Regions:
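Hydrophobic alpha-helical positions that pack around
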Residues: 149-153, 282-408, 420
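Flexible inter-domain linker/hinge segments
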Residues: 27, 131-199, 352, 359-374
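Ferredoxin-type iron-sulfur electron-transfer modules in oxidoreductases and energy-metabolism complexes
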Residues: 15-44, 59-83, 100-132, 180-197, ...
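C-terminal accessory/binding modules appended to enzymatic or scaffolding proteins
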Residues: 388-400, 406-408, 412, 570-618, ...
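Accessory "access/gating" subregions that flank catalytic or transport cores
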Residues: 182-223, 378-380, 385, 393, ...
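Conserved phosphate/anionic-ligand binding catalytic regions in large, soluble enzymes, centered on
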Residues: 50-58, 197-219, 318-330, 336, ...
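Short amphipathic, charge-patterned alpha-helical segments
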Residues: 70, 257-259, 409-424
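Iron-sulfur cluster-binding cysteine motifs and their immediate structural context
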Residues: 92-96, 498-504, 592-609, 622-635
Length: 635
């Protein structure tokens, strides 16, 4: 059906609202009651996470088996199985949610499907073993509203993820989808829209935090026959999956936001730049674009107006540097993904030399709801200079790994210990890396820092796109700095000397230190060279690449000193600094370690304690892996 007016859009919303009403109603209430057909339930819905993580853990197999069991029990008219986007609680996936009682089943397997149908759907009895167990109380929790992981979250950018079928445009419309676009086209001038975005205080969520409305205003003021809207979906930070999850769970919000941006700046063409290794996000986005065209929400004369806009997808090869907007534009043009000096900014001369507005996925996901609920509503959330919420990919040595969205101003302590559930295994918190390879490592003294753009910069890190990696007492901070710098060196485009050569020298120094060959002078060189690279590199990648080194030097200088002065690694992560010995009290002389040593470094008589020759030992750890008596000691 082609939507030609706001009336047509409202008609579809009314029709689709019925399908979502059960989810909407259950979302507003908290109940301990379990609903099943035997207890009088007339209709039930089973929501299954269809994000990449859960799909990799056989969520499609769960769907298939549920459908088989539903058909077998002849209840197809009473039970729906719906694939939705990421629920966020990736640590406990695959996740299955039963509506209307909001039962939240975790770590479900395809083999559990028949039991879910027989026990819960038909019998009205929850399956206790599939419920989440609160680690603090050790009690099961059936409803996500009672879980610490969700309690302090505020889902704005993720509002539809885990709630609607991302491949059903009518479910998106039922959640006020495309009404922001309709209101803009029918009731607002482009400058009115830009003014709302400016007043909301929305800043770019891709790393730099530049005011979104101001960016749109620059592009709007350019005089040109052709302008472009670009969605930067080239999310490349290690461990980051915020943008990918939004595209997988709510692709229509990106399509709608790009249309709104096109109207605001005077563009008729949108381009999504996405890495080819995100097949699910690509497929969901393709489906959304096709559906929007079929419904008349993309193409010529949208909603019967003079405004025309369409979207194409362009694929990247996974280069981290192409997250920088000028490098991204060059890649889309078929050139090497290398950044260029600014000015000119893309708003003046971007794709094919035309004015171009570039926003990342999360930034765009906020646009429709800001226009629907108003700039003042959005501006009340967050801090004075950082409005709204931020999506983070919480990973590392933390109990609750997953995707979270919290208001700006939430502290690191709240994120790590309340939402994240604390450190795995009860170990001691050591550091948290925010901002991915471009960010820094923050310590316990920073835990009460309210998270926003300015506070993280002041603390020696940055917001970045939203990666948040938690480390415990077993992590070596020199090795962490080396890991991130190794990534940056690999991903450098090589255009400017500070990044191409300077970062290689930094990496060589870190390798030297972790191999036990470093000196105290090397630490001074790390600090000096790192600052030079920050000051002189061409683009954001190079300018921020020394951050992990400089922040760990600032916060863990004693650990660096142990590596260069004492030639020890307290975390036992740097192999070259380890010494393997055999405990004569524990060794029974079974000779198993000697048989498996690839360097013939272990000697001894059978049934007598063995010894390791330190000059021959290559520190591979094979002896420790084979010893059954814990006789191998490492110091």
């Amino acid at each position: 059906m082609k939507i030609l007016s706001i009336h047509d859009l409202a008609t579809i919303r009314k029709r689709a609202e019925h399908n979502l009403s059960l989810r909407e109603e259950s979302n507003e209430k908290v109940t301990e009651k379990c609903y099943g057909l035997a207890s009088g339930a007339q209709h039930l819905q089973i929501l299954i996470c269809g994000g990449t993580g859960c799909k990799a853990s056989s969520s499609q197999g769960i769907t298939d088996n549920l459908l088989k069991a539903i058909k077998k029990n002849e209840i197809t008219d009473k039970v729906e199985v719906i694939t939705v986007g990421c629920f966020g609680f990736c640590e406990k996936g695959p996740i299955v949610k039963i509506i209307p009682d909001n039962t939240f089943y975790t770590q479900v397997t395809p083999e559990d499907a028949e039991e879910i149908i027989n026990e819960h759907i038909i019998g009205g009895r929850r399956i206790e073993r599939l419920l989440y167990v609160d680690p603090k109380t050790e009690h099961t929790v059936s409803d996500s509203k009672h879980m610490d992981f969700y309690r302090k979250q505020l889902r704005i950018a993720l509002r539809n993820c885990g709630f609607i079928d991302p491949e059903n445009i009518e479910e998106y419309i039922a959640r006020e989808g495309y009404f922001a676009l309709a209101d803009c086209l029918l009731n607002k001038k482009p400058t009115d829209v830009i003014d709302i975005i400016k007043r909301s205080g929305l800043r770019g969520r891709g790393g730099g935090g530049f005011p979104t409305g101001l960016k749109w205003e620059f592009a709007n003021k350019q005089q040109s026959d052709v302008k472009y809207v670009v969605c930067n979906a080239d999310e490349g930070d290690p461990g980051a999956f915020m943008d990918r999850s939004i595209m997988e769970g709510d692709p229509h919000s990106i399509v709608e936001a790009m249309c709104v941006c096109g109207y605001s700046i005077g563009s008729t063409k949108g381009l999504v730049y996405i890495r080819a290794e995100y097949p699910l996000a690509i497929n969901r986005l393709k489906t959304a674009i096709i559906q929007a065209r079929e419904y008349g929400l993309l193409g010529d004369h949208i909603l019967g107006t003079d405004f025309s806009f369409d979207i194409e997808i362009r694929y990247g090869a996974g280069a981290f540097v192409c997250g920088e907007e000028t490098a991204l534009i060059h890649s889309m043009e078929g050139k090497r993904g290398e950044p260029t000096l600014k000015p000119p900014f893309p708003a003046e001369s971007g794709y094919l030399g035309k004015p171009t507005n570039v926003n990342n996925v999360e930034t765009l996901a906020n646009i429709p709801i800001i226009l629907t609920k108003g700039a003042d509503w959005f501006a009340t959330i967050g801090t004075e200079r950082s409005k709204g919420t931020k999506v983070f990919a919480l990973a590392g040595k933390i109990n609750n790994v997953g995707l979270i969205e919290v208001p700006m101003g939430t502290t690191l302590r709240e994120v790590i210990y309340e939402i994240g559930g604390g450190i795995k295994g009860g170990k001691k918190f050591k550091a948290v890396q925010t901002g991915g390879p471009s960010g820094g490592c923050l310590t316990e003294k920073h835990l009460d820092t309210p998270i926003d753009f300015d506070n993280l910069l002041s603390a020696g890190s940055m917001m970045g796109s939203g990666g948040m990696l938690v480390m415990d007492e077993d992590d070596c901070m020199v090795s962490v700095a080396r890991f991130y710098l190794d990534f940056t060196v690999e991903e450098s485009c090589g255009k400017c000397t500070p990044c191409r050569i300077g970062n290689k020298r930094l990496l060589e120094l870190l390798n030297k230190i972790t191999e036990g060959k470093g000196t105290e002078k090397d630490l001074d060189t790390l600090a000096t060279l790192g600052q030079v690279i920050k000051d002189t590199a061409l683009c954001g990648l190079g300018q921020t690449s020394p951050n992990p080194v400089l922040s760990t030097l600032d916060n863990f200088y004693d650990e660096y000193m142990e590596h260069v002065r004492d030639k020890t690694c307290r975390s036992k992560q740097c192999k070259s600094l380890l010494t393997y010995t055999i405990s004569p009290e524990r060794c029974i002389g079974c000779h198993l370690c000697a048989k498996n040593c690839p360097a013939d470094a272990i000697s001894g008589l059978v049934r007598k304690p063995h010894v390791i020759a330190p000059d021959k030992c290559i520190k591979c750890g094979m002896c420790m892996a084979r010893c059954k008596f814990n006789a191998i000691l490492v110091c």
